[in-house]
UniProtKB/Swiss-Prot annotation:
It is an enzyme of class 3 (hydrolase). It comes from Clostridium botulinum (strain 657 / Type Ba4). The keyword DNA-binding applies. Pfam families: MSSS, MutS_V, Smr. Keywords: ATP-binding, DNA-binding, Endonuclease, Hydrolase, Nuclease, Nucleotide-binding, RNA-binding, rRNA-binding. Endonuclease that is involved in the suppression of homologous recombination and thus may have a key role in the control of bacterial genetic diversity. Acts as a ribosome collision sensor, splitting the ribosome into its 2 subunits. Detects stalled/collided 70S ribosomes which it binds and splits by an ATP-hydrolysis driven conformational change. Acts upstream of the ribosome quality control system (RQC), a ribosome-associated complex that mediates the extraction of incompletely synthesized nascent chains from stalled ribosomes and their subsequent degradation. Probably generates substrates for RQC. Its EC number is 3.1.-.-, 3.6.4.-. This is Endonuclease MutS2.
Amino acid sequence: MKDKSIKVLEFNKIQEILKNYTCTKAGKDIIEDLKPYDSVYEVREHLEETKEAFKLLITKGAPPFEGVYDIRNGIYLAEKGSALLPGQLLKIAAVLRCARRFREYINHKEQEESYRVLENICEGIFSLPKIEEEIFNAIEGEDEIADRASSTLYNIRRSLKEKNYSVRDKINSLVRSYSSYLQENIYTVRRDRYVLPVKAEHKGAVPGLVHDQSSTGATLFIEPMSLVNLNNEIKELMLKEKAEIERILTVLSAKINANITGVKTDANIVWELDFIFAKAKFASEYNCTCPTINDEGIVDIIEGRHPLIDRREVVPISVKLGEEFTSLMITGPNTGGKTVTLKTVGLIHLMAMSGLMIPARENSVISYFNNVFADIGDEQSIEQSLSTFSSHMKNIVEIMDKADENSLVLFDELGAGTDPTEGAALAISILENLRKRGAKIIATTHYSELKAYALRKEGVENASVEFDVETLRPTYRLLIGIPGKSNAFEISKRLGLPDYIIDFARENISNENIRFEELIQNLQEKSIKAQEDARLAENLKLERDKEKKKYEEKLEGLQKVRDNALIDARREAKNIIKEAKEEADKILKDIRQLERMGYSSDARRKLEEERKKLKDKLDSIEEKEIKTVHKGEALKNVKEGDEVLLASINQKVIVLSKPDNKGDVLVQAGIMKITANIKDLRAAKGSNFNSNSSKTKKSKKLNLNLRKVESSVDLRGMDAEEAIYTVDKYLDEAYLGGLGEVTIVHGKGTGVLRKTIMDMLKGHPHVKRYRLGEYGEGGTGVTVVEIK
């Protein structure tokens, strides 16, 4: 990308604005080096990171940048093995804390939107909470080490405090004793030693060491001899304190050095995030959107705004290029906004290719170009010198040397500054050459010859900036498909030029030119009307979309309320089922106890009565849940091989048998074969619950049909293979039926069948534990199994 074009399009001013949104000098340095990226992939990734940061600002508020510093100097010193100052260590700890908090800020919960690019960046954070904690624990301020930094420091400072109390008590006593010899009845400190301000003429009255004198010489600061030892002890303690502080700082600095890779990585990530969120804050402030990026030369800027023009005054422009036409000729009067249009298109492209969201409407399309060339200068003056033409031509020669099919070329007043006939011919030749190379071109011009060139040349389109003749002011709106009109006669008339002069001027223009100008005016009026109608239609569409979105959000909210209600209902049903299961287990244990005591007949009757009560209760829960959750009608007929939805466990199953006279069918759910009733089956195709099946599969679902699962299975008379198949099927049904404990009757016999069954139970997924029956349960002829 040419630096000259970047400068001409004023991208550096965007960089300066961006810097205002950063928190660190390092972030500003990243922005200082910001330029368009080298590939469409990089552009898309950096735009995505900006969009993600923009969404985070909206959904989670400001990122945790509190206390973020530029710690590059501290890192450099630590890497060299130097001991850092307390303030430098504090700043490093603050950056480490910011990195850790940022990881928490970025990480999303399951129901939240994920942020792929930012999460990948934050994956690189080392997170060093131990070092962070040690520094904050040891250092309280820029020059203040906490007492808790070490037990040695704590003891030294406690001793210092005690010694200072002793010295102050003694020196206060001396102040009272020597008050007549002192300038003031106070004590002071010189060079960390307690002294008295003695009048010079009484220096012999206070025996001690002179440490200082006043500027006039009238006062001597004398350390009384009785305080020398105490002051010495205080000085020694202060030296020990200093040495301990240096040791603490050295140890902490060494820990930074030992983890320098992690510290540097975390700091660099924080600074990168500072830069990314600066882009997001800019986008929020300037009402920017994320464009679609292509590498096919297609441009569709919808209501783009120049970000450097006052937002209250800027007029949005819409520009298309690259599909129906690859060159756009913009004509119209001076000060009409032609140059601003060029700069807007160029600057928006530079912003997008640098990973910045653009000041334009949603669904804008930007093409990735290897180069954006801009020949834009101050061409608004009346007189244009040869030197100006030469300067532009030198720039154009350079563009002609480098432009190709992956280039966007912007020309302002191409061919101006020389003879109009020669200038127009030269401009057409330049444009045609670039067009044949495949370059995308937008050019402004005054020349009528270029209007005609655009009209007759395929792939080239005219455009103009709208001018309001009534107010004599441009509206700055871009009209694509309509060549510009000079409006010289209309402007002159409104400014007061006599009609006879204007009429005489018209006579000197050919009828063909007059008809052409009238045609342009007619087209402009129709285009303006069409654009007003289009804007009205667009506003109506936006209003409709807004209302649609509002109702969709309201519907989504109602659906969430419904889903939450269903979850609560299912939770309540599970609790009831759990209580019922526990009650059934208790009854089974009571019955076995009664059987041991010889009350088998009554016990069995009681069991059946209680099981019937449970069945009725659970069936009512099942029916209620199915009616609540599943709106689809139950299937009336199924055949072997059909894939259907088993509503009670919300899972697709395969039908293995035809319904019996009770409506029960055998189905396969994964590796398990279970019995279900046809009333519990729904059509799998188009089911509203298919999308949720992956979520519900993970949680254990209970088959509520207790009436189908007996509390025991009898294997007597079966061979080993048949018994294993029967027990495996039975345990599946017992597990889904929610039974806590079951009995397998295998008989005593030779013990072969018992051993076969026990070997099988050892690794069975549904078995928690098992044992041989006790007296009254069937002894060694049965195995009692506890289900998970």
